[in-house]
A protein has these predicted regions:
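N-terminal binding-site loop/beta-alpha segment at the start of enzyme catalytic domains
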Residues: 1-81, 334-338
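Terminal-tail/helix-coil boundary detector
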Residues: 2, 225-256, 271, 275, ...
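Short, well-ordered coil/turn segments that N-cap beta-strands
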Residues: 10-15, 46-48, 77-81, 117-121, ...
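Conserved, mostly hydrophobic/aromatic
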Residues: 17, 35, 42, 50, ...
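A cross-family glycoside hydrolase active-site/sugar-binding cleft signature
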Residues: 18, 53, 84-86, 123-126, ...
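A short acidic, helix-capping loop that chelates divalent metal ions and anchors anionic groups
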Residues: 21-26, 56-58, 90-96, 287-290
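Glycine/proline-rich, positively charged
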Residues: 90-185, 189, 199
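Aromatic-lined glycan-binding groove of carbohydrate-active enzymes
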Residues: 186-225, 260
Length: 338
């Protein structure tokens, strides 16, 4: 069984599965049965942490498509898994309801129905919309926790000031921000804040949208429909070429540890922080199992220090973050790096 970690009160496997790609974001999706089987196999090898969102599926299918798949795959083992999902809140729908709480609850009820459950373990605000008070969302999440409808809540793509204010209203279980060897911005403030305040940190795109696996090359053709990689600046040909030194570092350590590049990139962040639980995404069962296997790749302190020093000596070219951000102020933090 895989080692466990804590996201505040939630006990999860050290690595989770990002389920988005089964419905959204990385081009053509597998057959439904394949996706369901892949999630069940991940559970069988010890993964209990599955990440989805109400919006996944909206481009090719419909919002909720991914939650339905996760529900079909895992409702038979519901009590043994930790399900994380996310909501977006628009100002007009908040205005149409009597309160932020009512608006949040109506999203939650719809997600629970699709997931085939009567509670969600970890409910994230997917993006902060500056026209909707996040303080009121935080208070609403507290009420939902009190009612037993969610076990914990979180924020995604959040900066440290917003996080601290939200945490003061209702303690946050986990932050889900972009974090990988190519996107280390959260090391400055957000992750240290989370470590200090017993908040879990769940990196999304931990393999840098596949780049760190070494399998994406300048010849890789991204798909026409619903493939986020077409818009990820780090995956422009010039950046793929310029970031090769990072792949060389990974390749050295992969050889040393008899592991894959993707596994080393995950083992690195697990070693670095005790509260980090990455959710790599893949629509391919073998790769899902490979990524979960990174929990067994243990770096010694010395190996980690060498890896860290080698990474710090590399310049990262291009970034990904801003394409993931809708709110103005936090979005500008990423844009400055262009
Ligand atoms: N909170 C947010 O705003 C947010 C944003 C984005 C994502 N997420 C969540 O985070 C999860 C992970 O993020 P992500 O999918 O964007 O990025 P990721 O995990 O860094 O990368 C996914 C890409 O890498 C490839 N890949 C994965 N493992 C591989 C391996 N071992 N070898 C070779 N290629 C591999 C996948 O291809 P194949 O599918 O072909 O294997 C896919 O193209 C998502 O599933 C989603 O749940 C959250």
């Amino acid at each position: 069984m895989m080692q466990k970690r804590k996201l505040r009160d939630l006990e999860v496997s050290a690595i989770g599965v990002g389920c988005m790609g089964f419905s959204h974001g990385y081009g053509k999706v597998p057959e439904t049965e394949y996706s369901i089987n892949a999630m069940r196999k991940a559970f069988e090898v010890g993964c209990n942490f599955f990440d989805t969102a109400e919006v996944y599926g909206d481009v090719v299918f419909y919002p909720g498509h991914n939650e339905e798949l996760v529900g079909k795959a895992l409702s038979s083992v519901r009590k043994d898994v930790v399900l994380a999902t996310k909501l977006h809140l628009r100002p007009d729908e908040v205005a149409a309801r009597s309160s932020v709480y009512d608006a949040v609850k109506s999203h939650l009820v719809a997600s629970m129905k699709r997931l085939g459950t009567d509670y969600v373990d970890l409910y994230y605000l997917h993006r902060i919309n500056e026209e909707v008070s996040f303080e009121e969302v935080a208070a609403a999440m507290g009420r939902l926790i009190d009612k037993g409808l969610i076990r914990g809540w979180g924020l995604s793509q959040v900066d440290v000031e917003t996080l601290a204010k939200a945490h003061a209203i209702t303690p946050v279980s986990a932050v889900q921000n972009i974090y990988s060897m190519l996107e280390r911005g959260c090391e400055a403030e957000v992750i240290p804040y989370c470590v200090e305040h017993n908040i879990g940190f769940v990196p999304f795109s931990p393999i840098a949208s596949g780049f760190l696996s070494g399998k994406v090359t300048v010849d890789t053709k991204f798909e026409e429909v619903d493939d986020v990689r077409k818009f990820v600046p780090q995956l422009k040909k010039e950046n793929i070429t310029a970031n090769q030194p990072i792949l060389d570092v990974l390749a050295d350590f992969s050889k040393l540890k008899n592991a894959t590049n993707a596994q080393i990139s995950l083992a690195w962040m697990l070693h670095k922080y005790p509260n980090v639980v990455p959710i790599p995404g893949s629509k391919n069962l073998e790769r899902i199992l490979e990524n979960l296997g990174a929990a067994d790749v243990t770096l010694t302190d010395n190996e980690f220090a060498q890896l860290e020093a080698a990474l710090n000596a590399c310049t990262v070219h291009g970034h990904r973050g801003f394409v993931e951000t809708e709110q103005h102020t936090f979005g500008n933090n990423w844009k400055k790096k262009e």
